[in-house]
Swiss-Prot record:
Its EC number is 2.3.1.-. CDD domains: NAT_SF. HAMAP family: Acetyltransf_YlbP. Keywords: Acyltransferase, Transferase. This is Uncharacterized N-acetyltransferase BLi01727/BL05157. It comes from Bacillus licheniformis (strain ATCC 14580 / DSM 13 / JCM 2505 / CCUG 7422 / NBRC 12200 / NCIMB 9375 / NCTC 10341 / NRRL NRS-1264 / Gibson 46). Residues 7-151 form the N-acetyltransferase domain.
Length: 159
């Protein structure tokens, strides 16, 4: 049985991330993010993943954003930023991406993401909707948002 788990910030995870870089799009690389967290000795990892056996096959980063800097949801509303969701080739279309997004939704907070690859069908299926583009706010990205009011929360654990 596979499950979503918080990834440790260590050299083993760094090696696993290098495997994604071999297959992935440069924009999805999380290597630099992980290295900076290692340098800062940040024990509260924003990285989550799914292992198939001993191999990391899917991952994402998930950051909680303070409501004071919220430009997408109700004023003062904390929300999650879901970044760099990626599933290795050969493991795609097995529900791993869906598991990661459902895990993020389980926190019961609104979610913002900026998909980088042709994945609009996936995000639509997951209940995400586009926001009205604002050049100053969105800076060339095409953000999508999900509101928890549309689905029941499963957990109150913090990201």
């Amino acid at each position: 049985m596979v499950k979503v788990e918080r990834l440790l910030i260590n050299y083993k995870t760094l090696e696993e991330f290098k495997k994604f870089r071999e297959y992935g799009i440069q924009e999805l690389s999380m290597l630099e993010d992980l290295e900076s967290n290692m340098i800062e000795n940040d024990s509260n990892s924003p990285f989550y993943g799914i292992y198939y056996g001993n191999r990391l096959v899917a991952r994402m980063s998930l950051y909680k954003v303070d409501g004071k800097s919220n430009q997408y949801f109700e004023e003062g509303q904390d929300y999650l930023e879901l970044w760099k969701l990626e599933v290795l080739p050969g493991y795609q279309r097995n529900g791993y991406g869906t598991m990661l997004v459902e895990f993020a939704k389980s926190f019961g907070l609104p979610i913002r993401t900026s998909p980088r690859v042709k994945s609009s069908d996936f995000w639509n299926k997951m209940g995400f909707t586009p926001v009205k583009y604002d050049m100053a706010r969105d800076k060339g990205e095409n953000p999508l948002v999900w509101h928890p009011a549309s689905e029941p929360s499963q957990s109150s654990e913090s990201a």
